[in-house]
Regions:
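Conserved HGGG/HGGXW glycine-rich cap/lid loop of the alpha/beta-hydrolase fold
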Residues: 1-42
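Glycine-rich His-Gly loop
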Residues: 8-11, 77, 167
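A short beta-to-alpha transition loop/helix N-cap that caps and shapes the active-site region
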Residues: 42, 102-113
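Conserved acidic catalytic loop of the alpha/beta-hydrolase fold
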Residues: 53-71
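Conserved hydrolase catalytic core segment
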Residues: 69-107
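The alpha/beta-hydrolase serine catalytic core
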Residues: 112-153, 157
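Short beta-strand/loop motif that positions the catalytic acidic residue
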Residues: 158, 164-166
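Conserved alpha/beta-hydrolase "acid-adjacent" motif
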Residues: 171-176
């Protein structure tokens, strides 16, 4: 579509296809851009460590490459976490934020959800040196076990108008 840019950021272990059913709707009013995060979808992993901070820097490089000077950002789950890091690091590029299921730190996730992730991470990490699949799983699960690392003070420094979406059955703690 045309109009003000809207970046759609998917969650961990997903791709731009997460937003497939919403692209047509948003494209009526916005220039919609839905990138795949490093190591997800069609974007190669590259070298070095995967982190939310690195994904935010990748997003900066991506919007600069496209010539986007400012955009609204809708982030789901880790996409919301990336959006927060991006807004803190590159505030001049952010119009408005929509954070759906984002969290500030790993303890913000309900224990009933986080515990199986932690167990899976430990198992995958144990086998990571013997299996490329286990290594990839350990990296992806590691993002959910170890990140993001933001504080309430960090969140208060986000200057863009922000809509936070949380559902009744959300995996993020209401108090978070």
């Amino acid at each position: 579509g045309s109009g003000f840019p809207l970046l759609l950021l998917h969650g961990n272990g997903e791709s731009h296809e997460y937003f497939a059913s919403q692209l047509e709707y948003f494209s009526v009013h916005y220039r919609v851009v839905a990138p795949d995060t490093r190591g997800h979808g069609r974007t190669p992993r590259g070298d070095g460590e995967l982190s939310i901070s690195r994904f935010a820097d990748d997003l900066h490089d991506f919007v600069m490459m496209l010539g986007i000077e400012k955009a609204n950002i809708l982030g789901f789950s880790d996409g919301g976490n990336i959006a927060m890091y991006f807004a803190l690091r590159y505030p001049e590029y952010v119009g408005k934020l929509i954070l759906n299921g984002a969290n500030l730190f790993p303890r913000g996730v309900k224990r009933s959800v986080q515990l199986p992730i932690e167990v899976g991470y430990r198992i995958a990490s144990h086998f990571a040196k013997k299996s490329d699949d286990a290594l990839k799983n350990a990296e992806i699960l590691g993002l959910m076990v170890n990140e993001p690392r933001l504080t309430a003070e960090d969140a208060s420094r986000i200057k863009a108008p922000t809509l936070v979406i949380a559902g009744t059955h959300d995996m993020i703690k209401r108090s978070h």
